[in-house]
Amino acid sequence: MTIALGKFTEDEKDLFDIMDDWLRRDRFVFVGWSGLLLFPCAYFALGGWFTGTTFVTSWYTHGLASSYLEGCNFLTAAVSTPANSLAHSLLLLWGPEAQGDFTRWCQLGGLWTFVALHGAFGLIGFMLRQFELARSVQLRPYNAIAFSGPIAVFVSVFLIYPLGQSGWFFAPSFGVAAIFRFILFFQGFHNWTLNPFHMMGVAGVLGAALLCAIHGATVENLYFEDGDGANTFRAFNPTQAEETYSMVTANRFWSQIFGVAFSNKRWLHFFMLFVPVTGLWMSALGVVGLALNLRAYDFVSQEIRAAEDPEFETFYTKNILLNEGIRAWMAAQDQPHENLIFPEEVLPRGNAL
């Protein structure tokens, strides 16, 4: 019989409690449990992007130069997607494609999947960080809920859309000019600007910008400073510590301008949260639809009439011809592996030509 001598107290902490104390300790930069996901993923995503844009070519995947080493600048450098022949392979460094060869892995486009997946989990980690801190200081979690909008857009564009297509090849590459090319691709192949989900996204983002401008200007206008020397030009101090603006005055002002105004701060700020986040969610939903090649707003009757009547043309039919041109020119350049050749006589020409 074995007898263990010792005294167990309730103050004794297990490993989880020790880690919890260290991770959530009050320090200059909060770590938290979410930091175990956020910091490594953000580090690898940014590190992979800087490495790719500095050193790695896209010659083997797109037939392009895409790094500073090859002469690109900040606007033209990119971490490009893998070749279409690799489909939806995760392109793990130790996988059958690269077989542990780092140079080969970079040539195949492995950095793109590396950056995309670590970037997605890094964004999720940042949202969890906001949840964790909100819970620690007893706030509502609306900051984290709002950040789900950018996460939804990133995941839908960089992951779900190419999963619905033939491979990662059709996702955006990580670069400024590369994103612009992807936008043109979306327009030419999906008529994205006429998609109602895109319209809701634009309304949400631009509407949020308008709301921010109005809100900031209104609050700034209502700052006041008491004192004998105060006048119209000296009474406003944007750096003062006290919150001195009047909601009643703001309500009276905008009631006279528009005829309607927000009645309280809670409804006003909820609306400023609702507009951009809903717009981002709707645009993400639309991209999921494009992944399945769903179409919206095809006005076929106008196309038929424009084809039959040389004098009939609308802005819609002109845009359709423009989309055909984008497809014809972009497909041959963007998908060289398909060996697409479009003779001059089949390229789209509008009635005006």
Swiss-Prot record:
One of its GO terms (molecular function) is electron transporter, transferring electrons within the cyclic electron transport pathway of photosynthesis activity. The modification N-acetylthreonine is found at T2. It is a multi-pass membrane protein. It catalyses: 2 a plastoquinone + 4 hnu + 2 H2O = 2 a plastoquinol + O2. The chain crosses the membrane at residues 41-61, 125-141, 153-166, 208-228, 279-295. Disulfide bonds: none annotated. Pheophytin a binds at Q130, N143. A plastoquinone binds at H215, F262. It is an enzyme of class 1 (oxidoreductase). GO terms for biological process: photosynthetic electron transport in photosystem II. Chlorophyll a ChlzD2 binds at H118. Its main location: plastid. It is found in: Plastid, Chloroplast thylakoid membrane. The modification Phosphothreonine is found at T2. Photosystem II (PSII) is a light-driven water:plastoquinone oxidoreductase that uses light energy to abstract electrons from H(2)O, generating O(2) and a proton gradient subsequently used for ATP formation. It consists of a core antenna complex that captures photons, and an electron transfer chain that converts photonic excitation into a charge separation. The D1/D2 (PsbA/PsbD) reaction center heterodimer binds P680, the primary electron donor of PSII as well as several subsequent electron acceptors. D2 is needed for assembly of a stable PSII complex. PANTHER family: PHOTOSYSTEM II D2 PROTEIN, PHOTOSYSTEM II PROTEIN D1. NCBIfam families: psbD (TIGR01152). Belongs to the reaction center PufL/M/PsbA/D family. PSII is composed of 1 copy each of membrane proteins PsbA, PsbB, PsbC, PsbD, PsbE, PsbF, PsbH, PsbI, PsbJ, PsbK, PsbL, PsbM, PsbT, PsbX, PsbY, PsbZ, Psb30/Ycf12, at least 3 peripheral proteins of the oxygen-evolving complex and a large number of cofactors. It forms dimeric complexes. This is Photosystem II D2 protein. The gene is psbD.
